[in-house]
């Protein structure tokens, strides 16, 4: 146990600090502080000694040097049980500091502001704060270090239970948190400055640092022989699988999380009406828009009832009673995810205790740029996320698509973006008719889409086709025409585009180029 007799407090985030300081003062703790924190505490009736008075050395260089002094760091690093340390501290008049409460200059918040200049960023790089945190954390058996106001209550409770003392176990956990905090802080600085080594801003600096936090231990990974955990990024607020709230059901598995991510990101593409996406093994097997969520689910399910078994269902509207009842009565489902769920829907789903029900809230219509990461042996592939749909829509055939066909082409194109390559999607009237995924040849994906439609009893005649990448040969067009496809949307860009367009003209099909590919591996 470490008895708290003296604490150094210097915080940029003042939340809860007055109340916490008053508790410390109630235990007779001497409080050292600097600048704005010292003024706030004094104004609130807390007795405070300035760090400059404690060290006998004034603040200098416009406040850049406040706590960088042997009396501060000696007081933090000196080991109480080491006679040599104790003797040396006595020789130089260094007194123990038993607690450090510090959070750092808001560097990330500063650089996130539009128009932030380099000089502003530099002035918000904290030097003394991280140095104190590291000193205190290194000497955790004797020093309590706090970087997060969330932990104030825990320390207050422990001090009350132990007569003003804090356990080494608690101190160790707080020390780990402090090192995590300074690592993330330095990483943010390194990323920001590294991106500005040359002219302009490089999105891929020479080194890249990011920190994730463990959210959940998983029973196993993609397969039972693999161990796994789910980590989430810091300060995430966007509606995503990482920020979903689980209302009921078993713990999410590794595959549940991966598939829910695919389903949720797909359904977020659709805002024009109630939409349902059913995903299996990270591929949409049914997507549909309806006049109601129930109709959207019915239509999505009808695309491929076999593959929907054990799938993930994502909705872009509140899960209502009728839709929840239809899902639970009709199929085995692993996860249902929606912006919200009505109390009646929650009650229905609760009858299936293993079904995981997640809500993700509303999501912004504006796209927030982000990076995607893919691990390869010995390295990491980093790219900007594929967040655009097309460059422009260009009709390249003699026949123009009808207004109805154009709507279906754009619907099917959005679905194809989320299907594993090579991806082919047949669609009509705002629903998928057949999905061909993950084949090594594009024509085979087209054949599978037709087979899926036939097995589901759906009519392909008059439907449209979306392809995530160009057709290298005309065979994909010939195959589509043979089953009744009337219009095609694809990126274009093949050496044989002219041959492919000619094939579409021969069959009286309309074809639209998007100028943008959507490979998904």
From Swiss-Prot:
User: Which EC number(s) does UniProt give?
Assistant: 2.1.2.3, 3.5.4.10
Alphabetical UniProt keywords: Hydrolase, Multifunctional enzyme, Purine biosynthesis, Transferase
The family database entries (InterPro entries) matched by this protein are listed as: AICAR_Tfase_dup_dom_sf (IPR024051), Cytidine_deaminase-like (IPR016193), MGS-like_dom (IPR011607), MGS-like_dom_sf (IPR036914), PurH-like (IPR002695)
A GO cellular component annotated for this chain's UniProt record is: cytosol
What's the entry's take on its domains?
The IMP cyclohydrolase activity resides in the N-terminal region.
Which family would the database say this protein is a member of? Belongs to the PurH family.
| Name of the protein this chain belongs to | Bifunctional purine biosynthesis protein PurH
Organism encoding this protein: Pelobacter propionicus (strain DSM 2379 / NBRC 103807 / OttBd1)
Recite the lineage of the species. Bacteria, Pseudomonadati, Thermodesulfobacteriota, Desulfuromonadia, Desulfuromonadales
User: Which gene underlies this protein?
Assistant: purH
């Amino acid at each position: 146990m470490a008895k708290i007799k003296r604490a150094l407090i210097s915080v940029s985030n003042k939340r809860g600090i007055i109340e916490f300081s008053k508790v410390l003062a109630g235990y007779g703790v001497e409080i050292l502080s600097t600048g704005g924190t010292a003024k706030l505490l004094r104004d609130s009736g807390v007795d405070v000694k300035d760090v400059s008075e404690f060290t006998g050395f004034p603040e200098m260089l416009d406040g850049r040097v406040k706590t960088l002094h042997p009396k501060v760091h000696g007081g933090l690093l000196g080991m109480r049980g080491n006679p040599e340390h104790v003797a040396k501290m006595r020789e130089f008049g260094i007194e123990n500091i038993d607690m450090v409460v510090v959070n750092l200059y808001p560097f990330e918040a500063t650089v996130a502001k539009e128009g932030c200049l380099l000089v502003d960023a530099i002035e918000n790089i904290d030097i003394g704060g991280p140095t104190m945190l590291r000193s205190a954390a290194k000497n955790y058996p004797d020093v309590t270090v706090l970087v997060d106001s969330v932990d104030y209550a825990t320390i207050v409770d422990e001090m009350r239970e132990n007569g003003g003392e804090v356990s080494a176990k608690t101190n160790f956990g707080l020390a780990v948190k402090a090192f995590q905090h300074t690592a993330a802080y330095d990483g943010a600085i390194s990323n920001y400055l590294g991106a500005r080594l040359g002219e302009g801003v490089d999105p891929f600096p020479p080194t890249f640092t990011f920190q994730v936090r463990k959210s959940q231990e998983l029973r196993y990974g993609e397969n039972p022989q693999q161990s796994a955990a789910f980590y989430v990024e810091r300060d995430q607020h966007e509606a995503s699988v990482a920020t979903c709230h689980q209302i009921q059901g078993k713990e999410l598995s590794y595959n549940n999380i991966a598939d829910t991510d695919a389903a949720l990101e797909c359904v977020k593409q659709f805002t024009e009406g109630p939409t349902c996406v059913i995903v299996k093994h990270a591929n949409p097997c049914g997507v549909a828009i309806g006049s109601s969520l129930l109709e959207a689910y019915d239509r999505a399910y009808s695309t491929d009832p076999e593959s929907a078994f054990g799938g993930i269902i994502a909705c872009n509207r509140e899960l209502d009673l009728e839709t929840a009842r239809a899902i639970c009565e009709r199929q085995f489902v692993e996860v249902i995810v929606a912006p919200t769920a009505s109390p009646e829907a929650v009650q229905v789903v609760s009858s299936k205790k293993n079904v995981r029900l997640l809500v993700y809230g509303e999501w912004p219509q504006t796209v927030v740029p982000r990076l995607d990461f893919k691990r390869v042996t010995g390295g990491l592939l980093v790219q900007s996320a594929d967040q655009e749909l097309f460059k422009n829509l260009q009709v390249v055939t003699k026949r123009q698509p009808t207004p109805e066909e154009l709507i279906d082409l754009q619907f099917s194109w959005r679905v194809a973006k989320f299907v594993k390559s090579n991806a082919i999607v047949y669609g009509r009237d705002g629903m998928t008719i057949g999905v061909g995924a993950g084949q090594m040849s594009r024509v085979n994906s087209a054949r599978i889409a037709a087979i899926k439609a036939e097995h589901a009893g759906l009519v392909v005649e008059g439907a449209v086709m979306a392809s995530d990448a160009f057709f290298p040969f005309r065979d994909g067009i010939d195959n589509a025409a043979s089953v009744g496809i009337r219009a095609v949307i694809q990126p274009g860009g093949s050496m044989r585009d002219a041959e492919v367009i000619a094939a579409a003209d021969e069959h009286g099909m309309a074809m639209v180029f998007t100028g943008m590919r959507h490979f998904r591996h």
